[in-house]
């Protein structure tokens, strides 16, 4: 459908029907919805792979879900999904295909970009990664002095850091504990300093992740890491090849840096940064958990990819989650979405989802460049339970904002905990189930009074309830389950972007600040080459204050 013939989203009959339905619902009460539908707790569930999804505690009825599915059909979600899986260039502003799904396709799959099957190239890189990972894990890969590598420092930023750093924390119990793995992303020199300060350079390998090998933060950190290595080893440039590998496509720049291009692992333009950690960007993770477990993770991704591609709308988990997000964002004016994993190993999971969701759907123009008249991506936030319960849950329970939330938990703890720590898992999960119940059903003034609470305190101890949550429960946290979870959220984000008619796969919003930083840096250092007159009065005054504080 071309721009001239496309009806604006909020003018479609399906949107109008949802708006009318929302008005008729008024202020839905979950207590009443459950009372009217005794089997709601089992009827409103889905199963995808190892994931059990309970969406019964949402402010929806069968009619709501039907109307939301009609909106998805009218906005071409299924058609755009098929175009993505076919390798069409649905990232229109960059004229690129969007094929992170090809990164986890089986060897015999056929996925074409510009008439070429990309799956053999994907598996060639995976095989190369596996060979390298086994060399490091077995001690065959040695540094310049002949010592085996024991420390790996991954240097990247954005998708080249958040994904592998998150997955390493999630799968820490599956890692080789004899290897130390650290991640550096911030151009603040303190990040690199703390990462290497107690490492033996003779036993340290740096993994430099930059598709173009020109990302300013990454190359600045990589250059400083190279200086540290050569200074500490008191050796020349030839040592670099034994202590640095590259995740890049720019062989010329990689070789210029001193890295042997035989140790360059490539990926492709059709892989967006925030969708890339299951590509070569995941090399450091593969070294940590081993190639077999990395492939288990890819199989988990692929399982949900196939579910998203083939499951009917009524049973399609990513479609459902995406539609629920549209329901709250566009018809309840919810501004944020909390992701609350009840697993310490998922401590970086929500930060990863922040980039996945907010960089994808933080857009204010549609695919045709026209301003949108509806809310798009939410603010995504959250930390692991039970910590959040003693921090911000107060606002969710008794504040004035509607904050839909996802609760993620596991029936079994990780396998290597001490017996006493394993016993704590039931307490953790008791909190997990209690919070969704409390958020949904609250506590009425009558229930508070029945406990003998003084009347003046009754309003303070009343819980309104009706806070919507999705519960995602799995047997245990494994590499496959991690892949399933990430793919679930990837495709949820896709669904919402398709409905909102935005390009979920570009990120022009990160560019302006980078351009301005290049102009401002010479003003800070006094190296010249910049015109202070280009600055607004506030920024100019701040630059002057900075220079004064630095004694310049």
Curated annotation (Swiss-Prot):
It is an enzyme of class 5 (isomerase). SUPFAM superfamilies: SIS domain. Its EC number is 5.3.1.9. This is Glucose-6-phosphate isomerase. HAMAP family: G6P_isomerase. InterPro entries: G6P_Isomerase (IPR001672), G6P_Isomerase_C (IPR023096), Phosphoglucose_isomerase_CS (IPR018189), SIS_dom_sf (IPR046348), SIS_PGI_1 (IPR035476), SIS_PGI_2 (IPR035482). One of its GO terms (molecular function) is carbohydrate derivative binding. Pathway: Carbohydrate biosynthesis; gluconeogenesis; Carbohydrate degradation; glycolysis; D-glyceraldehyde 3-phosphate and glycerone phosphate from D-glucose: step 2/4. The lineage of its organism: Bacteria, Bacillati, Actinomycetota, Actinomycetes, Kitasatosporales. Belongs to the GPI family. Keywords: Cytoplasm, Gluconeogenesis, Glycolysis, Isomerase. It catalyses: alpha-D-glucose 6-phosphate = beta-D-fructose 6-phosphate. One of its GO terms (biological process) is glycolytic process. Its main location: cytoplasm. GO terms for cellular component: cytosol. NCBIfam families: PRK00179.1.
